[in-house]
């Protein structure tokens, strides 16, 4: 098979497969560009759920004539220029591939004007050609991006698009998340020439509740606790569920430096803070904003920038946990003393965008000492004053909380699914945990092996594990015994996501399930698997999954908090019954009585 260089159009379409999943992905990328351009108003117009037209108009800085043609080229950006910039990302976008990727699967028109220019300029690609055209046009200061006929040249992708209303709901959710992150920006959404949503900019933090009620609903607003906590490294602001009030619809939005992200570490810290507050498997609702020095983050870990990694995961986890515990404990104390007869003013305010910029530049003077804040938590809470009657409305507590106040102060650990708080590692592969029942030691190796086994095992005989196609199919030479095992168990392996194409004394590996992608040498793994199957008289999904899990996880030698905490959370989610009755190989309670007795006698 001859190796050849891919064409620029094909390269862009491959990149678009990662960036442009559906119309909502296009809307997200373009809005992020508008926010990076300093826009205070963004108009979003879509037709037919975004399949026909997506038009994003903003009043940002605009793009000059000399840069506008370059803007639609791949890997061109004004946001970073060096490795140092990549390690300290302050903008929403940074890769410089969004416009190029979109233009490879749709017809794109880019119109922009800066304040220094007397006329605007438009760049567009001629249909069915790669030629870029530039012409002058009338346009106010700012930028308009028009995306027409999305996936017109990739019928397979267009076939997988959902119904018009479904795609539009995804776009609405993107706008909702963006509007929560940027209270200072007006968002106007139109669908089929009708205004569907109009979120007006809110300048004063005391009025944030107005947008919050529109985005999250009055039920959440009327039963949410305001959280505001800071130390020298981090800041957390937002609203969290009051566990003593009515059960809220599960709504979880977390932002880091104004970027909407999903992160198991954040969710785990919040869930542990609520471990004695909520009954059963109900998950707490929250809208939180975390500010952290961008040098302490790795944002370049996901094609759509939906995930991040913290360099100091343990410190972040501990900070979030302590911040929420302080707010929840103060609420319980206030409940037992006054039964919420007073109205609470939120502690502090949401950090404005200029504060984030100061933090990015290292000016940490906007943050106060965490220890000092913790010391004065009672004083901060007792000295709260209502400044706005509408703000008081947000903090009103329903009368029905009276009936449930006693439940907050009692432990609900029997009903909550958690092994406890992770303290540290014990070599080589154990985590030291602390819970209401004491200290325990959890085997991370056993936990990871079990999770991998679950990922590789179909729910029933009719199910099929999702296969991940390999970029380059792998050719594997087989012995007679290995070929015989493949012939006998090929369909079973196929249902497990391992797609092998036999051909005399060799096979082509086309796809594997996600966990197997971690394996460096897939060829050896497949050969070992076929030898194992050839020696087994009875083969089941569970046996193969167990063998693969042991083979994959035997290579793990080092652990970190970013890896361990989400793993423990995943075990808690998949196997809540293990909290009360764990397998002996997973966790063991530590008895410190003998050690304490020995110390006392020495």
From Swiss-Prot:
The keyword Chloroplast does not apply. Disulfide bonds: none annotated. InterPro entries: DNA_mismatch_repair_CS, DNA_mismatch_repair_MutL, DNA_mismatch_S5_2-like, HATPase_C_sf, MutL/Mlh/PMS, MutL/Mlh/Pms-like, MutL_C, MutL_C_dimsub. Keywords: DNA damage, DNA repair. GO terms for cellular component: mismatch repair complex. CDD domains: HATPase_MutL-MLH-PMS-like (cd16926). One of its GO terms (biological process) is mismatch repair. It holds the Pfam family DNA_mis_repair. PROSITE patterns: DNA_MISMATCH_REPAIR_1. PANTHER family: DNA MISMATCH REPAIR PROTEIN MLH, PMS, MUTL, DNA MISMATCH REPAIR PROTEIN MLH1. This protein is involved in the repair of mismatches in DNA. It is required for dam-dependent methyl-directed DNA mismatch repair. May act as a 'molecular matchmaker', a protein that promotes the formation of a stable complex between two or more DNA-binding proteins in an ATP-dependent manner without itself being part of a final effector complex. Belongs to the DNA mismatch repair MutL/HexB family. This is DNA mismatch repair protein MutL. It comes from Baumannia cicadellinicola subsp. Homalodisca coagulata. The gene is mutL.
């Amino acid at each position: 098979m001859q190796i050849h260089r891919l064409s620029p159009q094909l390269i862009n379409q491959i990149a678009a497969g990662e960036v442009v999943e559906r119309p909502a992905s296009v809307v997200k990328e373009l809005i992020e560009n508008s926010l990076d351009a300093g826009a205070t108003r963004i108009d979003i117009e879509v037709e037919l759920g975004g399949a026909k037209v997506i038009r994003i108009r903003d009043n940002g800085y605009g793009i000059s004539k000399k840069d506008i043609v370059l803007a639609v080229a791949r890997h061109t950006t004004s946001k970073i220029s060096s490795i140092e910039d990549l390690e300290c990302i302050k903008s929403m976008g940074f890769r410089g591939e969004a416009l190029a990727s979109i233009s490879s699967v749709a017809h794109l028109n880019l119109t922009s004007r800066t304040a220094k220019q007397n006329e605007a300029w438009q760049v567009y690609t001629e249909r069915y050609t790669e030629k870029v055209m530039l012409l002058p046009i009338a346009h106010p200061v700012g930028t308009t991006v028009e995306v027409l006929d999305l996936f017109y040249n990739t019928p397979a992708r267009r076939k997988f698009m959902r119904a018009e209303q479904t795609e539009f709901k995804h776009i609405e959710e993107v706008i909702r998340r963006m509007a929560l992150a940027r209270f200072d920006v007006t968002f106007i959404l139109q669908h089929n020439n009708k205004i569907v949503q109009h979120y007006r900019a809110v300048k004063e933090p005391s009025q944030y509740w107005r947008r919050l009620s529109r985005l999250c609903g009055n039920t959440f607003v009327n039963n949410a606790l305001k959280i505001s906590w800071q130390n020298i490294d981090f800041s957390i602001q937002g609203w969290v569920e009051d566990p003593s009030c009515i059960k809220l619809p599960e709504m979880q939005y977390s932002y880091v430096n104004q970027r909407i992200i999903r992160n198991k570490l954040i969710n785990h810290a919040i869930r542990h803070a609520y471990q004695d507050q909520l009954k059963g498997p109900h998950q707490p609702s929250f809208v939180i904003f975390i500010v952290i020095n961008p040098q302490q983050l790795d944002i370049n870990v996901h094609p759509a920038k939906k995930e991040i990694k913290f360099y100091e995961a343990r410190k972040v986890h501990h900070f979030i946990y302590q911040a929420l515990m302080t707010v929840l404990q103060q609420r319980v104390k206030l409940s037992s003393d006054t039964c919420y007869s007073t109205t609470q003013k939120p502690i502090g305010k949401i950090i404005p965008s200029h504060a984030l910029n100061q933090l990015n530049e290292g000016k940490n003077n906007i943050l106060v000492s965490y220890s000092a804040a913790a010391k004065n938590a009672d004083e901060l809470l007792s000295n709260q004053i209502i400044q706005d009657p509408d703000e008081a409305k947000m903090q009103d507590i329903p009368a029905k909380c009276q009936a449930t106040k006693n439940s907050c102060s009692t432990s609900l650990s029997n009903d909550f699914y958690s092994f406890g708080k992770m303290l540290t590692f014990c070599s080589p592969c154990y985590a030291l945990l602390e819970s209401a029942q004491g200290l325990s030691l959890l085997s991370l190796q056993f936990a990871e092996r079990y999770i991998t086994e679950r990922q590789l095992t179909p729910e029933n005989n009719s199910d099929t594990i999702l296969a991940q196609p390999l970029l380059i199919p792998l050719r594997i030479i087989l012995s007679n015994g290995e070929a015989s095992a493949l012939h006998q168990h090929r369909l079973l392996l196929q249902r497990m996501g391992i797609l092998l194409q036999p051909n005399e004394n060799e096979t082509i590996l086309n796809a594997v399930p996600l966990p197997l992608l971690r394996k460096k040498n897939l060829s050896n793994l497949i050969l070992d698997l076929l030898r194992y199957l050839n020696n087994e008289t009875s083969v089941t999904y569970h046996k193969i999954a167990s063998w693969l899990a042991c083979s994959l996880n035997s290579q793990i030698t080092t652990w970190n908090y970013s890896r361990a905490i989400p793993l423990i959370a995943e075990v808690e989610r998949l196997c809540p019954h293990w909290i009360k009755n764990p397998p002996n190989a997973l966790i063991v309670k530590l008895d410190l009585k003998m050690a304490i007795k020995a110390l006392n006698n020495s």
